[in-house]
C-alpha cells in the first residue's frame, strides 16, 4: 500500500530544509503532515519522522510570526515617535 510522501527524493532527502521555507510553505506542509499522521497508516518509525518534521515546521512558523510581530512593533514605534516630534 503506497504512502503519501511529502517533499522530493527519498528517505531523509525527501524534505526541503525547514530553514529555507517561507511561512506559507511551512504552514502548508505542516497541514499536510498532520493530515498524513491522522490517517494512521504508517509504522512507528515513519510516524515519528513525520511528527519530528511537524514539530520543526511548527517552530519555523512560530519564528516567522515572531519576526513579523517584531517588524510591526518596530514600525508602530517609529510611527508613534514621528507623531511626538
UniProtKB/Swiss-Prot annotation:
Disulfide bonds: none annotated. Signal peptide: none annotated. Pfam families: Exonuc_VII_S (PF02609). The keyword Nuclease applies. It is an enzyme of class 3 (hydrolase). It catalyses: Exonucleolytic cleavage in either 5'- to 3'- or 3'- to 5'-direction to yield nucleoside 5'-phosphates. It comes from the Bacteria. GO terms for biological process: DNA catabolic process. It is found in: Cytoplasm. Its EC number is 3.1.11.6. Coiled coil: none annotated. Its main location: cytoplasm. Keywords: Cytoplasm, Exonuclease, Hydrolase, Nuclease. GO terms for cellular component: cytosol; exodeoxyribonuclease VII complex. HAMAP family: Exonuc_7_S. This is Exodeoxyribonuclease 7 small subunit. It comes from Corynebacterium diphtheriae (strain ATCC 700971 / NCTC 13129 / Biotype gravis). The lineage of its organism: Bacteria, Bacillati, Actinomycetota, Actinomycetes, Mycobacteriales.
Amino acid at each position: 500500500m503506497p504512502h503519501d510522501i511529502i517533499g522530493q527524493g527519498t528517505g531523509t532527502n525527501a524534505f526541503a530544509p525547514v530553514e529555507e521555507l517561507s511561512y506559507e510553505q511551512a504552514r502548508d506542509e505542516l497541514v499536510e503532515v498532520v493530515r498524513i499522521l491522522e490517517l494512521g497508516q504508517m509504522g512507528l518509525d515513519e510516524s515519528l519522522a513525520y511528527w519530528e518534521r511537524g514539530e520543526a515546521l511548527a517552530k519555523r512558523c512560530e519564528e516567522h510570526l515572531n519576526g513579523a510581530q517584531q517588524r510591526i512593533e518596530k514600525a508602530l514605534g517609529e510611527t508613534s515617535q514621528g507623531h511626538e516630534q
